Amino acid sequence: IVPQFADAQNRHFNFDNFAPGLYAFARGLMKKVVIADTFAVAVEAGFASAQTLNTAEAWFVAIGYTLQLYFDFSGYCDMATGVGLMFNIKIPINFNSPYKSLNIREFWQRWHITLSRFLTTYIYFPLGGSRKGMARTCVNLMIVFLLSGLWHGAGWLFLLWGLMHGAASVLYRIFRKPYDGLHPALQWMINFGFIVVAWVFFRATSLTDALAIVKSMLMM
């Protein structure tokens, strides 16, 4: 990004950049104000009543937060991308339809892409990546995702969320062949279901509330 500021050509108005930039900003604003903020009202009420939700309500709240978080975060990113483009600055894409992912690895290639690249480049690769055997690869993955959890917040639930994604990544690494042999629709259901459950721990204010919602989702 920095070299773009030094380019003299980027200091002049360019309608070919301004128009799509304005569209991207408007799209992001709609995602945030119209969609994310609408879900936020129901989600806030749902998590406040975590102990009393039935199965349908628990799933509605969990999926609602899953969508709220995506539209909120990607909305802000779209607005930033749009403003940058209006000033002839191209900002890297940060989200690429992450909930279409069929496995956890693909999810992290589509979700918060800049963070994933940073952690891969500066943590995973220096630790040895996948070059030192399966056991070391699994340890490296766990370290990366635990740090990802801490990056989002210095709380135990963020750490647990990172641990869950690390464990899912390790399991996918170990059982990749049989998993990839499943029907794509089943892969999507498993992956999306896991992501939704993990977001419950990310959003909940206490482990007790998170477990209550998940138990309701599982009809326990």
Put a short name on every predicted segment.
Residues 1-220:
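Membrane-embedded transmembrane alpha-helical bundles that form the catalytic cores
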